[in-house]
Amino acid sequence: QFDWKEKLKFSFKNGEEFIFNVGSLILSASRFKYWAICPSTSQAYLFDFLTNAFEALGGVPKEIVIDNASTMMDKARTERSDGKVNPKFQQFADDFGFNIVPCIRARPNTKVKVENPMRVIDEIMTYNGLLNNEEELFEKMQEITNEANSRVCQEIGIPPILVFKKEKEHLLPLPNDKICSYYKNTTIHAKVNSCLLYTSDAADE
Protein backbone atom coordinates (compact mmCIF):
# COMPACT_ATOMS: atom_id res chain seq x y z
CA GLN A 1 0.00 0.00 0.00
CA PHE A 2 1.16 3.51 -0.83
CA ASP A 3 0.43 6.87 0.73
CA TRP A 4 1.90 10.30 1.36
CA LYS A 5 2.39 12.09 4.66
CA GLU A 6 2.20 15.64 3.35
CA LYS A 7 3.61 19.04 4.24
CA LEU A 8 5.53 18.33 7.42
CA LYS A 9 7.03 21.56 8.74
CA PHE A 10 10.37 21.19 10.49
CA SER A 11 12.66 23.80 12.08
CA PHE A 12 16.41 23.52 12.57
CA LYS A 13 18.40 24.97 15.47
CA ASN A 14 19.18 28.13 13.51
CA GLY A 15 15.48 28.78 12.94
CA GLU A 16 15.50 27.76 9.29
CA GLU A 17 12.29 25.99 8.25
CA PHE A 18 12.08 22.94 6.01
CA ILE A 19 8.80 21.65 4.57
CA PHE A 20 8.78 18.11 3.23
CA ASN A 21 6.58 15.12 2.40
CA VAL A 22 7.13 11.47 3.26
CA GLY A 23 6.22 8.71 0.84
CA SER A 24 5.31 5.34 2.33
CA LEU A 25 5.14 1.93 0.69
CA ILE A 26 4.22 -0.92 3.05
CA LEU A 27 4.18 -4.57 2.03
CA SER A 28 1.07 -6.52 2.99
CA ALA A 29 2.39 -9.75 4.51
CA SER A 30 5.51 -8.52 6.29
CA ARG A 31 4.42 -4.92 6.99
CA PHE A 32 7.93 -4.01 5.80
CA LYS A 33 8.11 -0.24 5.42
CA TYR A 34 9.87 1.84 2.79
CA TRP A 35 9.85 5.56 3.60
CA ALA A 36 11.40 8.46 1.72
CA ILE A 37 11.52 12.22 2.15
CA CYS A 38 10.36 14.11 -0.95
CA PRO A 39 10.03 17.86 -1.57
CA SER A 40 6.87 17.40 -3.64
CA THR A 41 3.97 14.97 -4.19
CA SER A 42 3.86 15.65 -7.94
CA GLN A 43 3.50 12.78 -10.38
CA ALA A 44 7.19 12.98 -11.28
CA TYR A 45 8.17 12.54 -7.63
CA LEU A 46 5.55 9.79 -7.26
CA PHE A 47 7.13 7.79 -10.09
CA ASP A 48 10.60 8.56 -8.75
CA PHE A 49 9.68 7.37 -5.25
CA LEU A 50 8.01 4.13 -6.37
CA THR A 51 10.81 3.23 -8.80
CA ASN A 52 13.47 3.67 -6.14
CA ALA A 53 11.30 1.79 -3.65
CA PHE A 54 10.97 -1.18 -6.01
CA GLU A 55 14.72 -1.20 -6.63
CA ALA A 56 15.47 -1.09 -2.89
CA LEU A 57 12.99 -3.91 -2.23
CA GLY A 58 14.47 -5.95 -5.05
CA GLY A 59 11.13 -6.42 -6.80
CA VAL A 60 7.61 -5.15 -7.39
CA PRO A 61 4.46 -5.99 -5.36
CA LYS A 62 1.73 -7.68 -7.42
CA GLU A 63 -0.77 -4.99 -6.45
CA ILE A 64 -0.66 -1.61 -4.74
CA VAL A 65 -3.52 -0.03 -2.82
CA ILE A 66 -3.68 3.73 -3.46
CA ASP A 67 -5.83 6.68 -2.49
CA ASN A 68 -7.69 8.93 -4.92
CA ALA A 69 -4.99 11.58 -5.38
CA SER A 70 -5.13 13.31 -8.76
CA THR A 71 -1.64 12.09 -9.67
CA MET A 72 -3.03 8.54 -9.65
CA MET A 73 -6.79 8.81 -10.21
CA ASP A 74 -8.57 11.09 -12.70
CA LYS A 75 -11.89 10.13 -11.13
CA ALA A 76 -12.18 8.86 -7.55
CA ARG A 77 -13.40 5.35 -6.80
CA THR A 78 -16.68 5.36 -4.83
CA GLU A 79 -19.27 2.87 -3.63
CA ARG A 80 -21.01 3.19 -7.00
CA SER A 81 -18.12 3.78 -9.37
CA ASP A 82 -14.77 2.10 -10.08
CA GLY A 83 -13.31 5.51 -10.80
CA LYS A 84 -10.80 6.25 -13.54
CA VAL A 85 -7.06 5.69 -13.20
CA ASN A 86 -4.80 8.45 -14.49
CA PRO A 87 -3.44 7.19 -17.85
CA LYS A 88 0.19 8.04 -17.04
CA PHE A 89 -0.06 6.20 -13.73
CA GLN A 90 -1.70 3.25 -15.50
CA GLN A 91 1.20 3.18 -17.97
CA PHE A 92 3.64 3.24 -15.05
CA ALA A 93 1.81 0.29 -13.45
CA ASP A 94 1.81 -1.60 -16.75
CA ASP A 95 5.54 -1.03 -17.22
CA PHE A 96 6.27 -2.44 -13.76
CA GLY A 97 3.59 -5.12 -13.89
CA PHE A 98 1.53 -4.35 -10.79
CA ASN A 99 -2.24 -4.00 -10.44
CA ILE A 100 -3.75 -0.77 -9.13
CA VAL A 101 -6.30 -1.08 -6.30
CA PRO A 102 -7.89 2.32 -5.54
CA CYS A 103 -9.39 2.90 -2.09
CA ILE A 104 -13.10 3.67 -1.96
CA ARG A 105 -13.54 7.33 -1.06
CA ALA A 106 -14.85 7.87 2.49
CA ARG A 107 -13.84 4.37 3.55
CA PRO A 108 -10.53 4.98 5.35
CA ASN A 109 -10.20 1.46 6.78
CA THR A 110 -9.00 0.31 3.35
CA LYS A 111 -5.76 2.23 3.95
CA VAL A 112 -5.10 1.22 7.54
CA LYS A 113 -1.87 -0.67 6.77
CA VAL A 114 -0.26 2.52 5.57
CA GLU A 115 -1.82 5.21 7.71
CA ASN A 116 -1.34 3.55 11.10
CA PRO A 117 2.38 2.92 10.57
CA MET A 118 2.71 6.42 9.10
CA ARG A 119 2.12 7.69 12.62
CA VAL A 120 5.59 6.41 13.43
CA ILE A 121 6.98 9.00 11.05
CA ASP A 122 5.67 11.67 13.41
CA GLU A 123 8.47 10.57 15.72
CA ILE A 124 10.75 12.71 13.59
CA MET A 125 8.86 15.77 14.82
CA THR A 126 10.12 15.14 18.34
CA TYR A 127 13.47 16.39 17.01
CA ASN A 128 11.91 19.66 15.79
CA GLY A 129 14.30 22.49 16.67
CA LEU A 130 16.99 20.09 17.89
CA LEU A 131 18.86 19.27 14.67
CA ASN A 132 21.36 21.38 12.76
CA ASN A 133 20.60 20.66 9.12
CA GLU A 134 18.83 18.50 6.54
CA GLU A 135 21.54 15.85 6.67
CA GLU A 136 20.87 15.22 10.36
CA LEU A 137 17.13 15.14 9.66
CA PHE A 138 17.60 12.48 6.98
CA GLU A 139 19.78 10.44 9.32
CA LYS A 140 17.08 10.53 12.00
CA MET A 141 14.46 9.47 9.47
CA GLN A 142 16.64 6.53 8.47
CA GLU A 143 16.99 5.49 12.10
CA ILE A 144 13.21 5.62 12.59
CA THR A 145 12.61 3.57 9.44
CA ASN A 146 15.15 0.92 10.35
CA GLU A 147 13.83 0.70 13.91
CA ALA A 148 10.26 0.28 12.63
CA ASN A 149 11.33 -2.61 10.41
CA SER A 150 13.41 -4.22 13.15
CA ARG A 151 11.01 -4.11 16.10
CA VAL A 152 8.13 -6.52 16.68
CA CYS A 153 5.02 -5.59 14.72
CA GLN A 154 1.84 -6.12 16.78
CA GLU A 155 -0.12 -7.29 13.74
CA ILE A 156 2.22 -10.16 12.85
CA GLY A 157 4.04 -10.75 16.14
CA ILE A 158 7.59 -10.55 14.75
CA PRO A 159 9.83 -7.89 13.20
CA PRO A 160 8.87 -7.04 9.59
CA ILE A 161 12.44 -7.54 8.37
CA LEU A 162 12.27 -11.25 9.22
CA VAL A 163 9.06 -11.80 7.25
CA PHE A 164 10.27 -9.60 4.40
CA LYS A 165 13.07 -12.03 3.59
CA LYS A 166 10.38 -14.58 2.70
CA GLU A 167 7.94 -12.13 1.11
CA LYS A 168 10.71 -10.82 -1.15
CA GLU A 169 10.69 -14.18 -2.96
CA HIS A 170 7.14 -13.47 -4.17
CA LEU A 171 7.77 -9.99 -5.56
CA LEU A 172 7.60 -9.51 -9.32
CA PRO A 173 10.93 -8.97 -11.09
CA LEU A 174 12.01 -5.43 -11.91
CA PRO A 175 11.68 -4.26 -15.53
CA ASN A 176 14.80 -3.44 -17.53
CA ASP A 177 17.15 -0.65 -16.49
CA LYS A 178 15.93 1.62 -19.29
CA ILE A 179 12.40 1.69 -17.85
CA CYS A 180 13.63 2.22 -14.30
CA SER A 181 15.93 5.05 -15.37
CA TYR A 182 13.12 6.73 -17.31
CA TYR A 183 10.83 6.88 -14.29
CA LYS A 184 13.54 7.85 -11.82
CA ASN A 185 13.65 11.18 -13.63
CA THR A 186 17.32 12.17 -13.63
CA THR A 187 16.40 15.81 -14.28
CA ILE A 188 14.79 16.01 -10.86
CA HIS A 189 17.74 14.26 -9.26
CA ALA A 190 20.18 16.71 -10.81
CA LYS A 191 18.22 19.74 -9.65
CA VAL A 192 16.94 18.82 -6.21
CA ASN A 193 18.52 15.47 -5.26
CA SER A 194 14.95 14.16 -5.53
CA CYS A 195 13.54 11.86 -2.86
CA LEU A 196 15.90 10.81 -0.11
CA LEU A 197 15.54 7.11 0.22
CA TYR A 198 15.67 4.85 3.23
CA THR A 199 15.23 1.18 3.81
CA SER A 200 16.67 -1.29 6.27
CA ASP A 201 20.19 -2.45 5.46
CA ALA A 202 19.06 -5.94 6.45
CA ALA A 203 16.83 -6.07 3.40
CA ASP A 204 19.90 -6.59 1.25
CA GLU A 205 21.14 -9.56 3.23
Question: What label would you give each PLM region?
Answer:
Residues 82, 88-90, 94-111, 130-131:
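RNase H-like polynucleotidyl transferase catalytic core
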Residues 198-205:
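Conserved small/polar residues in nucleotide/adenosyl-binding loops
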Residues 124-197:
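Polar, glycine-rich mid-to-C-terminal structural blocks
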Residues 1-33, 42-48, 94, 180-181, ...:
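Mobile-element integrase/transposase regions
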Residues 66-67, 80, 100-122, 142:
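RNase H-like two-metal-ion nuclease catalytic core shared by retroviral integrases
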Residues 60-81:
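Acidic/histidine-rich, metal-coordinating catalytic segments
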Residues 35-60, 82:
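Active-site beta-loop-alpha junctions of metal-dependent nucleic acid enzymes
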